[in-house]
Amino acid sequence: VLVLGDSLSAAYGIRLEQGWVALLQDRLESKGYGHRVVNASSSGETTGGALARLPRALERHRPAVVVIELGGNDGLRGLPIADVRANFESLIRLSRDSGANVLLIGMRIPPNYGATYTKAFHELFGELAAKHRLPLVPFFLDGIALDDSLMLEDGLHPNAAAQPKLLEMAWPKLEPLLKR
């Protein structure tokens, strides 16, 4: 299972072993899955940066599943939606062409760039999931982002207490892909 993500998957601000990706490895082992988790996440990562790194990661790890948890940094920087969409399309195509199943994890952004951009960004994940028939976690921080007890002081990143909740957001969509 290759997790291609940003700071939310790279355990930003907490110990790596507290992050949801490390908890995913524990869950797989406890449930008897033979899958190994490779965390190819990087704080500050964009879809473009991940796209540059993906071919080598696919070749090196040959994943059965690729989890794409990206887009937040693209949105926070106001990158053109068409470019972000094209990057996601390429990430999905490369992953699928390698033989992997894909899970798309959606993100939302604050309305810094206006309602039109914010709406287009939010809708992008559902559109990609529908077009490519992908399982989708619509908003990874649902029930977390607005709860101060689950966020670091920066208000952007989930804390250690939030990590089991992030795993529970992803698990129902991820587990069926492990059985294919």
Where are these regions (language model features)?
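Serine-esterase "nucleophile elbow" of acetyl-processing enzymes
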Residues: 1-43, 53-62
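Alpha-helical cap/lid subdomain in secreted, periplasmic
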Residues: 23-29, 33, 49-180
